[in-house]
UniProtKB/Swiss-Prot annotation:
Subunit structure: Monomer. Interacts with TAH18. Interacts with MIA40.
Residue ranges, annotated region (Fe-S binding site A): 215-232
Biased composition (Acidic residues): 161-170
Biological-process GO terms, alphabetical: iron-sulfur cluster assembly
Gene source species: Komagataella phaffii (strain GS115 / ATCC 20864)
Domain notes: The C-terminal domain binds 2 Fe-S clusters but is otherwise mostly in an intrinsically disordered conformation. The N-terminal domain has structural similarity with S-adenosyl-L-methionine-dependent methyltransferases, but does not bind S-adenosyl-L-methionine. It is required for correct assembly of the 2 Fe-S clusters.
GO cellular component: mitochondrial intermembrane space
Annotated [4Fe-4S] cluster binding sites: C304, C307, C315, C318
Residues bound to [2Fe-2S] cluster: C215, C227, C230, C232
Compartmental location: Cytoplasm; Mitochondrion intermembrane space
Gene that produces this protein: DRE2
Cofactors demanded by this protein: [2Fe-2S] cluster; [4Fe-4S] cluster
Identification of the protein by name: Fe-S cluster assembly protein DRE2
Amino acid sequence: MNTLLLLHPTIVTEPQAVEAAKDSLAQKLGTDKSNISQHIIDRVATGQVSLRPSYYNHIQYLAPPEANVKKLPVKCYEIIFEALQSNGVFEGTIPPESATDGILQGFLVESDTKWVKPSTLGSVVSLKRPAGQNKTKSSAFKKEMPFFKKLSSPPTLTDSSEADEDEESQLNEKLKGSKLIYFDESSDDEIIDEDELLRDDDGALKGPVVVPVKCALPNGKRRKKACKDCTCGLKELEENEQNERLDAQASILSKLATSANAEAEKIEERLRRKQASKEGEEVKFTEQEVTEIDFTIQGKTGGCGSCALGDAFRCDGCPYLGLPPFKPGQAISIEGLGADI
């Protein structure tokens, strides 16, 4: 008996377990231990070791219990099936989930740990009848058969193939004509206006217009949220309201940012002036600016000509507001105005 022992890669590290399995298998099959060959299943699956086809009577798969969870590749079952003889047995630690793969390869699954390769050849059984029955049947059959008289000359046959071809051609022409009529675009075809299907001859609607039911609650209140398959337009209204709300928020935020920037610039300018006044920095004007401001310069007069008379006669924007009256041509110092400018 040709026997093969397939080993899991982790079981190879335990030589004692392998030898014990070989002894048990030899005792079970009643064969010599030397008749049992062994290979690692990974090498068989990758093709490094080739098995002889239809050679083994028994193939045993030895693996640790935890290997029962992981399925073997389908290629392994195909190789094992080809290596077994008819009625050969494959058993061992076979994953239960691999039963379908085994059936697809041709195995008969007898149990979770035993598969059998069925025999593809069946015995031929010849069916014979008794000799006496055959004779009686044949004689009776001969008596029942009628006899016909042979005619002296065979009847003449006429060739009707040409008529059949003519009929077939006429039938084909009729079929082609009927098909072409269906696809023919004739100007006589009447085109129906879709509006006429909705209105009568008087122009009135044939039936009431079906308005989609609004997404309203029984008590008359509006729903907080439109239905998933809303058809009354509530979903579009909600989207428009949301877009308007987002636009308003964006506008407010932009205005706030603009005002904040302007306010920050004013604060920075105010702080700069305050710091300059603390450090005693004097505001200096160019000659043209002094000429425009100081109306006491000879040959220059104010717009109203009353700057030297006092605040009662000075304009609202006069730079001499708050100063006492002075004589025309008198030198006026405006250094005190540095903090206000």
